[in-house]
């Protein structure tokens, strides 16, 4: 599963769910458009276990409510 949010013409945030070595993960990472017109990941991002998602969403909902 994948979600993309364009930040500019050359940058976007990609949210992905994946499985690595038996662990269900969620990754949020900034991608940039290379000179070769290919979207590549940057070092800017975070990956966490899917079982931590409720905590992250709870905090984001608190921010949204402010």
PLM region descriptions:
Residues 1-8:
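Negatively charged, low-complexity tracts enriched in Asp/Glu with abundant Ser/Thr
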Residues 12-13, 24, 54, 61:
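Residue-level marker of intrinsically disordered, low-complexity segments enriched
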Residues 13-44:
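A short, structured beta-strand/loop element
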Residues 44-66:
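Mixed-charge, Lys/Arg-enriched low-complexity segments
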């Amino acid at each position: 599963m994948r979600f993309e949010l364009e930040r500019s013409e050359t940058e976007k945030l990609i949210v992905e769910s994946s499985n690595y070595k038996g662990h269900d993960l969620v990754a949020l990472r900034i991608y940039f458009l290379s000179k070769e017109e290919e979207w590549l990941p940057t070092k800017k991002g975070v990956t966490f276990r899917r079982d931590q998602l409720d905590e992250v969403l709870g905090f984001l909902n608190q921010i949204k409510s402010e």
